[in-house]
A protein has these predicted regions:
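Long, basic N-terminal domains or extensions that often function
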Residues: 60
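Active-site pocket-lining/capping segments in soluble small-molecule metabolic enzymes
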Residues: 1-45, 63-68, 72-155, 162-571
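Short, conserved phosphate-binding/catalytic loop or strand-edge motifs used
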Residues: 49
Length: 571
């Protein structure tokens, strides 16, 4: 199916395809080289080293991580040459894109694969007090467009997936207005654009990280941060009618969402009927009491909040009309044939690769430790290797324990932190060089930007962690071609796909995480008022521990990730 899609896109001559999975990169590069490749923000490209890797891999554009400041973007632009794209408007995730496992943890639906259940928008309790600790404001950087252009951004990204044509039309029109305005007219353009954006019914706005490393107003626990304009609360329920006093105008045709007081999802519907007193009306003003016919599917209770999430449509073309218009511009079959031929060749090559024998690898157990004192674990039966985080504290311990480590260097794996912003990358380059000079050769990487850390160093064994998001054989082959000698498959993989993946003949061994703390979120958002080690609990009593280190917020599930009951099946 993927190859058919790539063939069709190549035939159409699209301006670019946005890639997250390196398996897609490998197929597109090999069989459809004319396709312009854009790196998704889900690839977590957040430093110059990562962008330079993309350049070498043939990408023409990088969609940068949303956690970067203008200063960091400027530095990346100065050291790289491909096009840079950045988000300017839309919902912000609490987690760094590509590093969130919250949704898959609570629902089995992966936010990394476009199926987020949005558990971050729910209510969590800290010391018995409820709050929306992970619910972020919406990004709105319309007043920073000149600064972003100066920093080197060549393309602005507006969130559009799962949004209505109405929303997209309003937001794009607002940003286009400001972009096209001469400098002397920009103030008036910003005012007019602000009025337009106010009709898109977003959450409270923030500039995100663009103006600094500690963003103001990005997450306020006391505010629900729910999408839309708060109209009031439900005060009566009678004969299918929801009664409330509205604090703004309401029209037939507006779209509402009823949000429960707990952390559950709301129900939405379009207003088709409403009564003022007992009289049907088309509109009411702020301050009036109105009863609205409940056309939603979910249950509604007294005290639930009512939000207006859409107004009178301005984009009126029906989906049927859109499909008819698209059919008129479809390419003739003759234009599509060359790409189809390449698709057949790609499929033949893939099917041939599937017929080989992957063989059976011997069991090998690697244990995750915290510090040098955990080297004693290497004396446990069956433990072949120990993996330690590469931290400043552990580097100091290496210098103090040279004699202890002399005979263990081949059994230690140093784990690079997943995020290396700005000057941190150079610090870790020096750390890697120091360790390599002392005879350490094995390192665990989690990001494309990690690979250049080892440039010029000989006999390095690079291994990919679970954050490399390996879910298919093509992704595994891609990482191998980039220099990796072993890979840990994604912790979001399922039984069926794992079985299929391990049947494939691959030039490098694959590993599976069988037990450990469950990483839920990795974020650059500081959680004010919550100390490192504190536990937040959902309404269902699910616990999540908050840890802060090196400028990052990490959230770990109280319940460990475990496949210990499936070890025999994995073998």
């Amino acid at each position: 199916k993927l190859i058919d899609i790539l063939a069709d896109l190549s035939s159409i001559g699209v301006d670019g395809i946005i890639i997250q999975d390196l398996g897609v990169w490998r197929l597109a590069r090999t069989w459809f080289p004319a396709l312009p490749l854009h790196a998704s923000t889900q690839m977590t490209v957040h430093n110059s080293a990562g962008v330079r890797m993309l350049e070498q891999m043939g990408f023409v554009r990088a969609v940068l991580a949303r956690e970067l400041s203008l200063a960091e973007i400027t530095e990346i632009r100065r050291e790289t040459s491909i096009e840079l794209e950045h988000f300017v408007h839309g919902a912000l995730c609490f987690s760094i894109s590509g590093q969130c496992f919250f949704s898959s943890t609570v629902s089995g639906m992966s936010g990394n694969r476009g199926r987020c259940a949005q558990p971050c928008r729910r209510r969590y309790h800290h010391r018995g007090e409820p709050g929306y600790h992970f619910s972020t404001s919406d990004l709105c950087a319309i007043d920073l467009l000149p600064d972003l252009i100066k920093a080197g951004i060549t393309s602005f990204k507006i969130e559009g997936r799962m949004k209505s044509a109405e929303y997209v039309a309003r937001v794009v029109a607002a940003y286009r207005l400001v972009l096209d305005a001469p400098a002397r007219e920009r103030k008036e353009a910003l005012r007019a654009a602000g009025e337009e954006l106010a009709l898109s019914f977003g959450r409270p706005a923030t500039r995100g990280f663009l103006t600094g490393f500690v963003p103001a107003g990005i997450a306020t626990p006391s505010q629900q941060g729910t999408l839309g304009q708060h109209l009031g609360d439900v005060v009566s329920l009678r004969q299918g009618l929801i009664g409330l006093t509205v604090n703004d105008r309401l029209h037939v045709g507006d779209r509402l969402r009823i949000q429960p007081q707990n952390d559950q999802a709301g129900t939405g519907f379009t207003v088709r009927e409403m009564l003022a007193g007992e009289k049907p009306v088309r509109a009411v003003k702020a301050g009036e009491f109105v009863r609205v016919r409940n056309a939603g599917k979910g249950s509604v209770h007294i005290g639930d909040a009512v939000f207006k999430v859409g107004g009178k449509p301005r984009f009126t073309m029906s989906s049927e009309a859109c499909q008819k218009r698209l059919a008129e511009i479809a390419l003739p079959e003759g234009r599509r044939q060359p790409a189809r031929d390449r698709a057949v060749q790609a499929l033949v090559a893939l099917l041939a690769a599937r017929t080989g024998n992957a063989g059976t690898a011997a069991d090998s157990l690697t244990v995750q430790g915290r510090g040098i004192s955990d080297c004693k674990l290497l004396g446990q039966p069956g433990v072949e290797r120990l993996q330690l985080p590469l931290t400043p504290e552990n580097l100091l311990e290496v210098k103090k324990n040279e004699r202890l480590l002399a005979g263990l260097k081949e059994r230690l794996i140093w784990e690079i932190p997943p995020m290396l912003f700005g000057a941190q990358w150079q610090e870790y380059r020096r750390a890697v060089q120091m360790l390599a000079g002392q005879g350490f050769h094995a390192f665990r990487v989690a990001n494309l930007g990690h690979i250049p850390l080892f440039a010029g160093l000989k006999d390095m064994k690079l291994m990919g962690g679970f954050r490399c998001s390996v879910l298919n054989s093509q992704a595994a082959l891609a990482w191998h071609e980039l220099g990796l000698a072993q890979l840990v498959v994604s912790i979001e993989d399922d039984r069926r796909n794992l079985a299929e993946l391990f049947r494939r003949p691959l030039p490098l061994p694959l590993a599976v995480t069988v037990y450990g703390p469950l990483p839920v979120l990795l974020s650059r958002v500081p959680m004010r008022g919550i100390r490192s080690g504190a536990v937040l609990r959902s309404d269902k009593e699910e616990g999540y521990r908050v840890l802060t280190h090196a400028g990052l917020t990490e959230v770990i599930g109280e319940q460990d990730f475990s496949l210990l009951g499936h070890v025999r099946e994995l073998r």
